[in-house]
Amino acid sequence: MEKNKKIIAGIAGAVALIAIVAVCIFAFGSGKEKKITENKETTTVAETTTVPETTAQPKGISMLTGEHISEKLADKRPVAVMYNNIINAIPHSGIDNAGIVYEAPVEGSITRLMALFENYGKLKKIGSVRSCRLYYCYFALEWDAIYCHFGQSKYALDFLKSDAIDNVGSFNAESGYYRTSDRVAPHNCFTSAKGIDSSIKKLDYRRKYKNGYKSHFSFATDNEKISLQSTKQANKVKLGYPVNKPWFEYNQKDGQYYRFQYGKKHIDDQNNKQLHCSNIIIQFVNATLYPDGKSLDMTLTGSGNGWFITNGKAEKITWKKDQKKGRTTYLDKSGKEIVLNQGKTWICMVQNEYSNDVKISK
């Protein structure tokens, strides 16, 4: 009997030992599997918190470029700065930050640029800044922009002093500008983010887009690339302006048009980058002289022809504008508004009599 008890006890002990070993194996094995599972889950969580557009993408969309920007910046009125563009005034400063640039002739067949900015907050040097011509006021109004200039033609003064346009000029905010010693006057006048913002505050201008304002342009959506149906290749675009002789060259790798003028790259001296854009609009317009026989005026209402150039191709378009303070629409051959690729745009006003000087080639 005693022997049987010992046998039973031995068997029980063996069973217990086996059970303990099994539990340990299970415990260690489970722990190992749990660790792998946790790693997998951690990796999955990391991916879902960094990839989704709802968290990674800013909420705002730029009215100027169609690109994602901060919501605060997207609601901020742009400023439109008049840039001097004769050879004594270059290199330009700060213009690479602009989302839209207008180029148009003034007297003597030189051009001036009007650069529209949303994001200029860190710029200490913007310019050089030059005087206003009346038709530039209407360009600025199309974007609900605050217009910045230093000086003006006599034909623009009454308009600027009225409440028709919010503007920062030498007659109402001279302290917002400063002069440098690196070039001679009048080509050495500059402003800055601080100068612009302090002037806007002083003049008590509205800082957000007006109620109901809608984007001037329609832009491609994310990951969409507009490719024109036209067969006309546009790898080089000469604008036909006789003095600065500007042109753009298309880079297929990044889809950008890089700008040249005065025989060399058009550079922003604040970052040493060559100016470039995703879209070019050429608008043919009628121009006349004021009674003084030298000041230029442009007919911006009615309709006319032009070119839309993007992604290596060009197509003929028409433009329409019903009233001076209205919005210019650009239409394709089917009568639909053009859709632009996201990014910067240059809008170039060319007098009808010089339309044949515009050259678009392979």
Predicted regions and their residues:
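Hydrophobic single-pass membrane-insertion segments
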Residues: 23-36
